[in-house]
């Protein structure tokens, strides 16, 4: 009889190093930003990044990685809600300035 309990997938055995976890976080934040610009105004993404950094890092004194994690949670939820409401973007995005015309705002620091 086989064991009915879930098994840990290969590579997720708890043997990761802290460096690998931080690398995963950085890759994931960059990936969600690349996808988010196809669905959300760049201005919104930039403002969420700036406000997350200001609140979690500067005011609350949290680490850089925790700040990125909180930002990731917010942007992931925003993209999810956008798609759930019936995304009609078709992956084309909204242009360099988001929904409004004009040049794009600067990207979040470290996410060029």
Curated annotation (Swiss-Prot):
Residue numbers spanned by region Disordered: 93-112
Biased composition range(s): Pro residues: 101-112
Annotated region described as Binds to human NUP153, given as residue ranges: 61-80
Keyword Transcription applies: no
Pfam families: VPR
Lineage: superkingdom: Viruses
Annotated phenotype, changing residue 66 to A: No effect on non-dividing cells infection
Record motif Nuclear localization signal, residues: 65-72
Gene Ontology cellular component annotations, sorted alphabetically: host cell nucleus; virion component
Keyword terms: AIDS, Host nucleus, Host-virus interaction, Inhibition of host innate immune response by virus, Viral immunoevasion, Virion
Compartments where found: Virion; Host nucleus
Effect of residue 69 to A: Partial loss of non-dividing cells infection
GO BP term, example: viral life cycle
Principal subcellular localization: virion
Subunit composition and interactions: Interacts with the P6 region of unprocessed GAG. Interacts with host VPRBP/DCAF1, leading to change substrate specificity of the CUL4A-DDB1 E3 ligase complex. Interacts with host NUP153.
Function: Plays a role in nuclear translocation of the viral pre-integration complex (PIC), thus is required for the virus to infect non-dividing cells. Targets specific host proteins for degradation by the 26S proteasome. Acts by associating with the cellular CUL4A-DDB1 E3 ligase complex through direct interaction with host VPRPB/DCAF-1. This change in the E3 ligase substrate specificity results in the degradation of host SAMHD1. In turn, SAMHD1 depletion allows viral replication in host myeloid cells by preventing SAMHD1-mediated hydrolysis of intracellular dNTPs necessary for reverse transcription.
Family: Belongs to the lentivirus VPX protein family.
Protein name (Swiss-Prot/TrEMBL): Protein Vpx
């Amino acid at each position: 009889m086989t064991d009915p309990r879930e098994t840990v997938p290969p590579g997720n055995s708890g043997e990761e190093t802290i460096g690998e976890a931080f690398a995963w976080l950085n890759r994931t934040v960059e990936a969600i930003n690349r996808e988010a610009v196809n669905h959300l105004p760049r201005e919104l993404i930039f403002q969420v990044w700036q406000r997350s950094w200001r609140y979690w890092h500067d005011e609350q004194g949290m680490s850089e990685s925790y700040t990125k994690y909180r930002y990731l949670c917010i942007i992931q939820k925003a993209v999810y809600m956008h798609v759930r409401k019936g995304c009609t973007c078709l992956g084309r995005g909204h242009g360099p300035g988001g929904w409004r015309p004009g040049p794009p705002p600067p990207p979040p620091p470290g996410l060029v």
